[in-house]
Amino acid sequence: MDTEPEEFAPVVILDEPYWVYNFTRGPPADWDCPFTYQIGRYDEVRPGMYTTPLFGGERDLHVGIDLGGPAGTPVHSFAEGTIHSFGINSEDGSYGPTIVVEYDLSWPPAPLNANPKRKVWALYCHLSTESLDGLAPGQRVQSGGRIATMGKKHENGGWEPHVHFQLSLVEPVVPDLPGVVARADREQALIDYPDPRLVLGALY
């Protein structure tokens, strides 16, 4: 991906080599990743992965980036922003604890903030329940500030520990947006939910 993003803080500090998953052939069976950190890709069709009723049997195109690590791994805000909303998406296979942060960013990101500013929202999902303690809408967050930790499987929607990070140019009504869409909806979804590497950098 040929982008030169302005300076943003890492959402997860990847301080050692990491594994980039390829889920286009479905989730790997009977294989334990030997790396502490893992990446799940954006704009990836993931057949056989989303099997709960929440996904309606047709949504399998991933429109965020997954940053995997041990439960309790700190999650940081990539820029200065404001808590927009938060809550627990409790359906089986959903996000579990979720925080939405609102940002005013030069968009798309460019050197020297060359582009006009606009509001952009970021979802931080599959968090620990305690990550929501003490939060309030309108609360300011600092660039690089710790805002959450990765949740355990029993609290994060039923997934291995990771944070689903997703950008949105559409303001969420509630602390939830589709992180997986139907393939027929891909074109509009990639407009509404742009590539997180615009702020995360070239992770792969």
Question: What is the predicted function of each stretch?
Answer:
Residues 1-70, 186-204:
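Polar/charged, compositionally biased leader and regulatory segments
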Residues 56-91:
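Short, glycine/small-residue-enriched coil/turn segments at secondary-structure junctions
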